[in-house]
């Protein structure tokens, strides 16, 4: 194998657990229970009503990310203007549903925007990347989302220097599981599909996309996403340490 394709969110970087922790903490301070689930549900419902939702869906930009993305990438000015009222409405409706104080919606929306800017890695991530380099593997990052937020995560986590290539769906216009994104990486390094492997936590995006591109697929099952019977990985691991231990790559 010559090329390792890697996902970012919840593969190398803790993403969903951080959003959950921040929202639950804000909920406790606001005196409401189950705040993460309520905010997530309202955000997803209202996000689907946004005029740009088909584009967001195509590039894999989530409703939770819309609660803290800066939308500072040129061309996303309309999203930046839309985001403030969207966030306030999400928190207001979540508070109303929970019997909280809806007048605190803006305060909590702004608090989440600030406090969500955390980029903790999974404990084994750095050692895994070092081992990949020791083995002489080229590293490419394939991540879905809007450019400014994904690059903020990448830099904030101190990961940028590891990758020879970074493909962000919002920059190239296509996202996982579209096999064209995987083929872009293959072409950039001049390797055949059988000389590469994709490592990611999302069966629908990472595993399915890799299989469509003819690339070996490693599912990092962190217990955050259900198994997809139509997207079977070549290797299933509990964390990144098991990838090279399996000697399947």
Swiss-Prot record:
> What cofactors are annotated for this protein?
Mg(2+); Co(2+)
Any one Gene Ontology MF annotation carried by this entry is: L-phosphoserine phosphatase activity
Q: Does the keyword Nuclease apply?
A: no
E.C. number(s) listed in UniProt: 3.1.3.3
Domain of life, per UniProt, equals Bacteria
Catalytic reaction annotation: O-phospho-L-serine + H2O = L-serine + phosphate; O-phospho-D-serine + H2O = D-serine + phosphate
The main enzyme category here is hydrolase
Q: Which Gene3D superfamilies match?
A: 1.20.120.1600, HAD superfamily/HAD-like
One Gene Ontology term from the biological process aspect of the record: L-serine biosynthetic process
- Which InterPro entries does the record cross-reference, listed alphabetically? HAD-like_hydrolase (IPR051400), HAD-like_sf (IPR036412), HAD-SF_hydro_IA (IPR006439), HAD_sf (IPR023214), PSP_YsaA (IPR044266)
Protein transport among the record's keywords? Answer: no
Where does this protein act, in terms of pathway? Amino-acid biosynthesis; L-serine biosynthesis; L-serine from 3-phospho-D-glycerate: step 3/3
Alphabetical keyword list: Amino-acid biosynthesis, Cobalt, Hydrolase, Magnesium, Serine biosynthesis
Q: What happens when the gene is disrupted?
A: Cells lacking this gene show serine auxotrophy when grown in a synthetic MP medium, in contrast to wild type. Addition of L-serine to the medium restores growth of the deletion mutant.
Q: Describe the family membership recorded for this protein in Swiss-Prot or TrEMBL.
A: Belongs to the HAD-like hydrolase superfamily.
HAMAP family from the xrefs? Answer: PSP
PANTHER family for this protein: N-ACYLNEURAMINATE-9-PHOSPHATASE
Q: What's this protein's function?
A: Catalyzes the last step of the phosphorylated serine biosynthetic pathway, i.e. dephosphorylation of O-phospho-L-serine to form L-serine. Is also able to dephosphorylate O-phospho-D-serine with similar efficiency. Displays a poor activity on L-phosphothreonine, and cannot use L-phosphotyrosine, pyridoxal phosphate, glucose 6-phosphate, or fructose 6-phosphate as substrates.
On subunit structure and binding partners, the annotation says: Homodimer.
Protein name (record): Phosphoserine phosphatase
Lineage here is: Bacteria, Thermotogati, Deinococcota, Deinococci, Thermales
């Amino acid at each position: 194998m010559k090329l390792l394709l890697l996902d970012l969110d919840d593969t190398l970087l803790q993403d969903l657990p951080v959003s959950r922790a921040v929202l639950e903490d804000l909920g406790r301070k606001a005196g409401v229970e189950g705040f993460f689930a309520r905010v997530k549900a309202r955000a997803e419902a209202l996000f689907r009503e946004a005029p740009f939702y088909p584009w967001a869906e195509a590039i894999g930009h989530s409703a939770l990310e819309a609660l803290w993305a800066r939308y500072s990438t040129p061309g996303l000015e309309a999203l930046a203007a839309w985001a403030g009222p969207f966030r306030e409405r999400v928190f207001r409706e979540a508070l109303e549903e929970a019997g909280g104080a809806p007048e605190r919606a803006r305060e909590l929306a702004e608090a989440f925007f600030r406090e969500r800017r955390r980029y903790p890695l999974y404990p084994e991530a750095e050692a895994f990347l070092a081992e990949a380099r020791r083995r002489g593997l080229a590293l490419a990052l394939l991540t879905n989302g809007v450019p400014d937020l994904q690059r903020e995560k990448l830099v904030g986590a101190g990961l940028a220097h590891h990758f020879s290539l970074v493909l962000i769906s919002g920059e190239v216009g296509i996202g996982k599981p579209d096999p064209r994104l995987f083929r872009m990486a293959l072409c950039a390094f001049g390797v055949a599909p059988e000389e590469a492997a994709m490592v990611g936590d999302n069966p629908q995006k990472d595993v399915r996309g890799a299989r469509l591109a003819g690339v070996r697929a490693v599912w990092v099952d962190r217990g955050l996403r259900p198994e997809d019977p139509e997207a079977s990985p070549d290797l299933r691991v509990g964390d990144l340490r098991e990838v090279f231990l399996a000697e399947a790559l």
